[in-house]
């Protein structure tokens, strides 16, 4: 597609141009129309405003970035990657004295400064001013040091500003290395040559081509370096890391099922033996040569050995020790893809697009006009990084952090002995030693792996597509002025007035790095100030050059490049010339070139230069926007008379970078930082110089200052800013008007087009300003500024005007000239009102017909956007108040003022409510809290009403985007969190409720959310007390007391569902029992003093308290118990015989042996309760008989410990009762599980905040914590599948007693033996044993009834039902071996076919249980 077609198509998509014939000398006609090029969707006022629910959180779009989401291991609620778990590294510098503390008069604050460092302000977050105001106040310091550091004293939540979802952030990294691209290629070619020679000459095998995976030649060098970094082939196989290594090789998720196998096979076949051979060779060389000789063998330069030896030592040292080149560290300037394409710059966007016939490339069946490159028309699409290729490694944040740890470990292992002081503590690194090692690596190139780094990553990587901030952060944090997403479009930033963001200035970028990740020396795009915030992880070392030394430093870079090119221009291979020549002729080398082409970013660019022949109009040198890859040793910079400053950027600190300041940064470990650019009014004095520098460097301009000034005059209400803009643009307007006059005099009539695209000169690469001349020659065209065109005009004798020898209008029409204007005359008239210089009359028409001006504005500039309030005010003040036009304007203006007041009032109310939000107390135990509906329906309705009014209002005002943003957030928030609301995860629901308090939501939302939370809270308490049978009297009385039991019951009546009626009945029964007991107590208290209270009545009261676990205060219970115990002791002292209940021993013995549940009728007489009159072993009197009885008791107690593991038995009691419960956790048929199931796993708990994993066979979800003692780590390889121990295939048979604490038969024997004891253990040991046996017996009987017929497994029983019972048994740790064995075998037979299908298809099965 030609450049002319590009312009036509873009102009047509964005807005159809309006062509006119006018007389230039008479100025622009007042009715001229402008082709407005706003890129927003309908109802979207401008790119600086928030236009959707998602962009209300992140001011970006997802249109030019695809998250690299791949098939992951099937899991529910994967264990979150918590920022708190990240091991960060800090750089520490030995202080050269105490840092000076200096008072800064403009800010009224103190800052600290050390020698060779930058000013550092340390403030609490509540003391922070507006970021741009702070920048303006410290500009005097920034102009001297280049940077200013602001360190925030961390508050309770130090990750408040972390506006990314760390679990869903995916990105492509660039591969950085410690030498130049040329030398890196030399190393790689040497590797392939050695590998080829090894296979063909040493191993005597045939190796002709490199394997291909997914239609791409495998990068063996990268594969080997990744595997070696992870510990080698065996370690990667053991840890199942092949899928991750595949991502690091840039392979996509759709082939992950076969990728691991392919990579493993390729490595074993080609590289494994080579690794062993290399290790043996290295060991042999180590015996013969010292380490320096080994290192010099790895890397040699192009000069001959003799010359290298003869070269002066000081010259070698200068290059080798002071000036270095590091691959892929270059900082890049972002530009719109289509502008780069039109201007002939290399583009990289399409090179990453997968070819698909009929989609990416048209065919005969393709509809007319279809063009894949414009599938996202109407949006700013930025070109991809030149370092992003099809082989770029893909990471999520967790995987990248793990890779950074592996890199850190590898470097420590290699250099720890040489740098003992550096790695003495892994959490802190001495700065000087850190720098020394870094520059040592640059000079010696000892590292065999790349440093994968993400530089300038678009903020769209954490966009709505991966569901980030709306679920993570309260709106008060989103609206925080120090949230970097808000800074580019801050009210004090001129970037808010951009029509078209050609350079991604209004969106933030991210850097993600590890140890020795580097961003090379660079100056900010267009000298714009920037702010960098280190969100997470380790410290960065930041170098900065003072702005006044910018030219000196650029000269140093140029000199370094010249010397580098002269001395190290042609690296030499370590492979001999004959071997290399032979290797280059092989098919293996050609296969390597195929792999190199996919990985080499220099070959991915797509150029489409749209130009005249070189002899017609000279073109300009084009650059791709990358800055230098040179690294200088700090002392070398200082020695060249350049001031260099250093600082460290820790987590939670900001670095302000000032215009013309060169900076460079190096990471000390894993970090994630964010960068934002902004344009304060003070930047305007650098804007002209920045434009010239951009043109001189051959970079594509990112903005036009003159266009920005006019937009500021049109849209800003700030009188100071408006005056500054007028002063700055006045000279340009005069010059433009004079050139317009000359053009009219020389040519007369030209075509005029109004549009807003490509106002960049093809000759100088400078912005053309408010107008441009488009010279078209056939299908080609060139843009020139009006000034450039006038200079190029020639006038031969015949009077015909020509340019470069081609007539402007000859009869053949070879050359045509068209004038394009950025603004219409009406808009210019408003913007330039007040400029009284006569030449401006050639630039605009001073026509006082404001009604016509209004019509022009409505049909051009503001056709798809709202009108700024100041323009309406201007038109009202310049028109007759008696005209209909004025009355119409004033009516709209007055309505807008009323609407503005309503919006202000609503925003103030909303902010007051949001700021008053505190942590919610949900209550505990029986003391549960009714949750308030924070925002009334009235507030949500008011917001909706305001939104409708604001949306229909045609006038733009500052409160408008806030209302739109709030409305979209309130609408989208319930949708984004629907899964949480519909689920039963109480922790997530509570967290959601807390977040919701800062959003005006409908009452229907609040009602549903609060009702669900309250119900789940109630059920959680019910399970703790009534199912797990916890003793209430041992609980905190502030949470569990009798008065609170009533409120707990009322709470349940309000919030429970119909399915909870049985549970409410149990609570009611407990209350009635309490009332009955209290009635008995009242009867005791009413008796007169002579009356006596029966001891049996007191015992009945205590028995009820124990049996029903009534929430009686422990002091009351202890006092009653004390009275009874004292009476019994008195009887003993008086030789009064206490009759023990021995009559029913034979009955209960027989019932227990027969597994008859009727034994519970007699249990209270033998379970250590009040009715069990046997003395406690702890009260042994010491008589001979008592000693014999004590001996029998101890034997029984030992037997109990052996069988029941008494201590563990007490710990698992709640889970036994919970898992053996068949009332509240009833069997749910398979077809109803998706709707009705609320309890999962062996533990039979609800879906909690911990990670869960699904069994591939039974489809049950299991908590990871419940498998292998929580040590199961689900791999991210989808080839590896989890199968629970119940579905485990026969070949992986697991001992059935795995996890069993006791067998039912053993428990029965213990109970039978306890019946004959004369001394019993302290309560509640016996009671727990009897209760557990009753539950287990009931469970066994029910299971036999449901699953067995005549002692055999019922073949009609579904495996789903059988596994339900097996699952509960395993969770209870109670063994029914004679029943579970046949049930497991039955399931294994049923599951055999499914297991076979999985294994036959290459799936790897894990159970989470050691084999």
From Swiss-Prot:
GO term, biological process aspect, one: response to oxidative stress
Pfam families from the UniProt entry: ARID, PHD
Keywords from the named record: Cell wall biogenesis/degradation, Metal-binding, Nucleus, Zinc, Zinc-finger
Stretches the record annotates as Disordered: 285-312
CDD domains reported for this sequence: ARID, PHD_Ecm5p_Lid2p_like
Keyword Kinase: no
PROSITE patterns: ARID (PS51011), JMJC (PS51184), JMJN (PS51183), ZF_PHD_1 (PS01359), ZF_PHD_2 (PS50016)
Domain JmjC: 476-695
Zinc finger (PHD-type) boundaries: 1238-1290
Gene Ontology terms: cellular component: chromatin; cytoplasm; nucleus; Snt2C complex
Domain JmjN: 118-159
Primary location class: nucleus
Record's subcellular location: Nucleus
InterPro entries per record: ARID_dom, ARID_dom_sf, JmjC_dom, JmjN, Zinc_finger_PHD-type_CS, Znf_FYVE_PHD, Znf_PHD, Znf_PHD-finger
Gene3D superfamilies: ARID DNA-binding domain (1.10.150.60), Cupin (2.60.120.650), Zinc/RING finger domain, C3HC4 (zinc finger) (3.30.40.10)
A GO molecular-function annotation: DNA binding
UniProt entry tagged with the keyword Metal-binding: yes
Location of the ARID domain: 185-279
Misc: Present with 259 molecules/cell in log phase SD medium.
Annotated function: May be involved in cell wall organization and biogenesis.
Stated name of the protein: Protein ECM5
